[in-house]
Every structure is written in structure tokens, then in C-alpha cells.
């Protein structure tokens, strides 16, 4: 199986690769369009700002390629947010518009933003991506922006407000948390993705 991590020049690429290697996967970090097209699975991790990530994808001529991918593609944290229509970060940043849902800054009158640390998910719809995972499983989050619950949401998390923590749309899968930092639960989710 050919597994590609799209090189967005973000800081968590190597930690995602380490987890995949631990699971016995042959994984390449690349921005080569030919390698991406020929892959069996794609991961789009991201840390930082939507504006910076979109500039990188545009510079590498990857925007249309990602949108046209037919193989299973997993967006992690910012990578999931990039699947949305736009982010209100820096007033307005256009993203990949794979799903017609905006990404908005989180708000809580009592909790600190960004949302940092462990939190559980509440599953709304059964899906192969969540096999072996239930509402008691905790994942590691680190984000200030989120997607509200929408037609692609299969699990959500509460942090001052409910937000989408797992989404599925066609061949695109997204998780707001970091599976590579989420111990057993994260490893189980990645295994499930690899089996889809």
C-alpha cells in the first residue's frame, strides 16, 4: 500500500509518519503530484494558520489535485479545516471548499482558547473510521478554530460549544484532534483509516 503524507511544511508531519511507520506502513512525505496521484491513501496534516497552509498548497499547485482525489484522504487538525469552504481567520481565508461548511474561531466565556489537551468525542453515526472507538475514548486537541456540526459530522466534541471532531464526505475524512498524539485511540483511528 502506498501512503502519502502531503508536505505542507507543517510541524507535525514527522510525528504522523512515525505513527504510520510503527503500524508497519511504508510512508512518504511529498508534494510530488505524480506520487500523490499514484498513492492508495493520502494524509493531509496541518498545524498553524489556514492562510499559510493554503499559500503552500497554491505554491505547490496542489489545490485542484487534492479536490479531485478519489482515494481515501484524511485531514488532520488544520488539514480537516482546509476541507471547508472558508476560514474566518484573518477576516476571511478561502480554503479547499470540498464541503460547503465554514471554519470559525472558537468562543467560550469561561474556557481558555485555544482548546489544548485531552477531550472525548460523542459519536453521532456509526462508521468504519470509528470501529473500536466509543464515546469514552479521549483524543488530544490543539486548535482555536473549528467546524460547527454539519451534514458531514459523524462525531462531535464539547468545549464551550459543540464542534465537529470527525467528519466524512465521500472519500474525504477529517479529524480535528491529533491521532498521532492520542495514544491507543489515535492509533486505532489510523488503523481504521488504512483499512477503508
UniProtKB/Swiss-Prot annotation:
The active site is formed by 77, 178, 180
Q: Which stretches make up the Glutamine amidotransferase type-1 domain?
A: 2-196
Cysteine disulfide partners in this protein: none
SUPFAM superfamilies in the record: Class I glutamine amidotransferase-like
So what does this thing catalyse? 5-[(5-phospho-1-deoxy-D-ribulos-1-ylimino)methylamino]-1-(5-phospho-beta-D-ribosyl)imidazole-4-carboxamide + L-glutamine = D-erythro-1-(imidazol-4-yl)glycerol 3-phosphate + 5-amino-1-(5-phospho-beta-D-ribosyl)imidazole-4-carboxamide + L-glutamate + H(+); L-glutamine + H2O = L-glutamate + NH4(+)
The record's GO CC annotations read:
cytoplasm
Say yes or no: keyword Iron-sulfur present: no
Q: Where in the cell is it found?
A: Cytoplasm
Q: What is its main location?
A: cytoplasm
- Which biological pathway? Amino-acid biosynthesis; L-histidine biosynthesis; L-histidine from 5-phospho-alpha-D-ribose 1-diphosphate: step 5/9
Q: Spell out the molecular function terms from Gene Ontology.
A: glutaminase activity; imidazoleglycerol-phosphate synthase activity; lyase activity
Is the keyword Coiled coil in the record? no
The catalytic activity of this protein is classed by the Enzyme Commission as 4.3.2.10, 3.5.1.2
The protein's UniProt keywords, in alphabetical order, are: Amino-acid biosynthesis, Cytoplasm, Glutamine amidotransferase, Histidine biosynthesis, Hydrolase, Lyase
Q: Name one GO biological process term.
A: L-histidine biosynthetic process
Source domain of life is: Bacteria
Reported function? IGPS catalyzes the conversion of PRFAR and glutamine to IGP, AICAR and glutamate. The HisH subunit catalyzes the hydrolysis of glutamine to glutamate and ammonia as part of the synthesis of IGP and AICAR. The resulting ammonia molecule is channeled to the active site of HisF.
Tell me the subunit arrangement: Heterodimer of HisH and HisF.
Q: Which HAMAP family match?
A: HisH (MF_00278)
The name of this protein is Imidazole glycerol phosphate synthase subunit HisH
Amino acid at each position: 500500500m502506498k501512503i502519502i503524507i502531503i508536505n505542507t511544511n507543517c510541524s507535525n508531519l514527522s510525528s504522523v509518519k512515525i505513527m504510520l511507520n510503527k503500524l508497519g506502513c511504508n510512508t512518504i512525505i511529498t508534494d510530488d503530484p505524480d506520487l500523490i496521484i499514484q498513492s492508495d491513501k493520502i494524509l493531509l496534516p496541518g498545524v498553524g494558520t489556514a492562510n499559510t497552509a493554503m499559500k503552500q498548497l497554491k505554491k505547490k499547485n496542489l489545490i485542484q489535485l487534492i479536490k479531485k482525489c478519489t482515494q481515501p484522504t484524511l485531514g488532520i487538525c488544520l488539514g480537516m479545516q482546509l476541507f471547508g469552504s472558508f476560514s474566518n481567520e484573518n477576516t476571511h481565508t478561502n480554503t479547499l471548499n470540498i464541503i460547503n461548511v465554514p471554519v470559525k474561531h472558537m468562543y467560550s466565556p469561561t474556557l481558555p482558547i485555544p482548546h489544548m489537551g485531552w477531550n472525548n468525542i460523542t459519536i453521532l453515526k456509526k462508521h468504519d473510521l470509528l470501529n473500536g472507538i466509543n464515546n469514552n475514548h479521549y483524543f488530544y486537541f490543539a486548535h482555536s478554530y473549528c467546524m460547527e456540526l454539519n451534514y458531514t459530522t459523524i462525531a462531535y466534541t464539547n468545549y464551550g460549544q459543540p464542534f465537529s471532531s470527525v467528519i466524512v464526505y465521500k472519500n474525504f475524512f477529517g479529524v480535528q484532534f491529533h491521532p498521532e498524539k492520542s495514544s491507543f485511540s489515535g492509533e486505532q483511528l489510523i488503523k481504521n483509516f488504512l483499512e477503508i
